[in-house]
């Protein structure tokens, strides 16, 4: 879907050009690498005009998504944008008058006309300075209000809460009946696969140690998912677990909510230097992956750009112990393989379907019951234009559980991270950087390891005639990635081997 670009123009565009002037270079891949004098990114470049011209639809969109907005946020953008344009018009007028006064001074070496022009120029200089300061304030008011707004929503996204999700497809074998004997914690305890007690002693509730075959299963799942992503054209990347909180916010993640007092959803690293940027543990590899593309301009001929990141996800909100947080289902840290793509604005929807096909290929190979859901408006968060979830049946829990997610964020992240592209064509070559279109970004889970382990243990447990668990049947696709672990002989591959 093509997204209309901002036509704010004027000082905002001049500011962006000034930040970049003389600081762009092109690498061997044809990427314009933009160097700024400060380590921080330029302010987000949001489309105030589009917001101002669509107050009703933008307000309804926020309402449908249950976004918690400041009072009158959408209308505030429109009011401040109108004021910004008025001030800019007056500022340009005063600048023109000052220019005329300057020409008069140049033409007259002396005399009353020159003296009057000098006096007028001095007065206009003060007016221009005052108007520039007022314009900056109006810009900041526009930005502050606009940053609170969520992305637009795909017209086919279901309206409502999580229960309104639409099942798009089902895959894999028929779901087994719900059975408490298949609880993954009980199975893991029996085979010494999971050490929650030590995790609690060492780090606290919702931390864990994987042991024996469970540790090997994590390695096998990781390499299996990475290998398929690479086969589908994704470039492998290992990501840092630490990111600047500014990058997370620009991606649509809020390190702290607006409760009183604020509740942190991410782990914050204590500053040792007050001048250092705030650092957090990444909630997903999506954040550092998106950051690698920030403040760059790509040639559309080299797009889409596709990477698969191996990282750890840290979640501070694992929550109180309950059936929903039992064992490995909701934890504070887990290994996660993340698919990330940067596309042109007219190809992101087709890329979403391409990524979904990769996710289904990975998960269908595990031979577990799956369903793909089109998620409703209240589940989209701030950044997603459309979101698919893939859930696996977990008979021990007696319910479906999310094992993968996929979001098309359109230009929500790229406008905040300054990810642009240069379209092909004769006129595009001469297009100034500030007028180039923003790219679209997409992210999807290739493998969230603990949830997959839950699904594999609960669906693959083997019981004897007395109802005692005696082994684990694992999918054959993992066998090439399995290392060691043959001493106990509890794993049976679904190709009949052990």
Language-model-derived ranges and their functions:
Residues 2-174, 193:
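N-terminal alpha-helical targeting/anchoring segments
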Residues 44, 70, 86, 171-498:
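TRNA-recognition modules of translation machinery and tRNA-sensing kinases, especially anticodon-binding
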């Amino acid at each position: 879907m093509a997204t209309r670009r901002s036509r704010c123009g004027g000082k905002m565009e001049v500011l962006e050009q000034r930040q970049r002037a003389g600081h762009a270079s092109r690498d061997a891949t044809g990427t314009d690498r933009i160097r700024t004098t400060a380590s921080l990114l330029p302010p987000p470049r949001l489309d105030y005009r589009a917001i101002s011209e669509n107050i009703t639809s933008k307000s309804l969109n926020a309402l449908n998504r249950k976004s918690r907005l400041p009072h009158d946020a959408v209308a505030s953008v429109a009011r401040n944008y109108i004021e910004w344009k008025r001030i800019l018009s007056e500022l340009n007028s005063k600048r023109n008058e000052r220019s005329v006064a300057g020409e008069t001074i140049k033409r007259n070496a002396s005399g009353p006309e020159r003296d009057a022009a000098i006096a007028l120029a001095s007065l206009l200089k003060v007016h221009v300075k005052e108007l520039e300061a007022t314009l900056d304030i109006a810009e900041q008011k526009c930005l502050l209000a606009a940053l609170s707004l969520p992305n637009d929503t795909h017209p086919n996204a279901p309206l409502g809460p999580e229960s309104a999700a639409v099942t798009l497809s089902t895959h894999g074998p028929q779901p087994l009946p719900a059975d408490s004997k298949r609880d993954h914690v009980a199975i893991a305890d029996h085979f010494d696969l999971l050490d929650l007690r030590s995790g609690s002693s060492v780090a606290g509730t919702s931390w864990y140690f994987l042991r024996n075959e469970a540790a090997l299963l994590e390695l096998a799942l990781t390499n299996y998912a990475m290998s398929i992503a690479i086969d589908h054209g994704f470039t492998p990347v290992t990501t840092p677990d630490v990111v600047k909180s500014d990058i997370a916010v620009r991606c649509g993640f809020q390190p702290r909510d607006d409760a009183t007092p604020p509740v942190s959803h991410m782990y914050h690293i204590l500053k040792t230097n007050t001048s250092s940027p705030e650092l957090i543990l990444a909630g997903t590899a999506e954040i550092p992956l998106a950051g690698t593309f920030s403040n760059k301009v790509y040639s559309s001929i080299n797009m889409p750009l596709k990477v698969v990141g191996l990282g750890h996800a840290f979640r501070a909100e694992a929550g109180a112990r309950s059936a929903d947080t039992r064992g490995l289902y909701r934890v504070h840290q887990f290994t996660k393989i993340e698919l990330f793509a940067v596309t042109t604005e007219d190809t992101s929807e087709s890329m979403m379907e391409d990524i979904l096909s990769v996710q289904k290929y990975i998960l269908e190979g595990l031979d577990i019951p799956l369903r793909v859901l089109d998620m409703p408006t209240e589940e989209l968060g701030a950044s997603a234009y459309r979101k698919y979830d893939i859930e696996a049946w977990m008979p021990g829990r007696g319910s479906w559980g999310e094992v993968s997610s996929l979001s098309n964020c359109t230009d929500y992240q790229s406008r905040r991270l300054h990810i642009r592209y240069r379209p092909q064509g004769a006129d595009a070559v001469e297009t100034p950087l500030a007028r180039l279109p923003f790219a679209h970004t997409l992210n999807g889970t290739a493998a969230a390891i603990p949830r997959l382990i839950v699904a594999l243990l609960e669906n693959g447990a083997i019981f004897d005639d007395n109802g005692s668990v005696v082994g684990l049947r694992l999918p054959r696709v993992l066998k090439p990635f399995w290392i060691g672990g043959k001493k106990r002989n509890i794993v049976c591959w679904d190709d009949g081997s052990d």
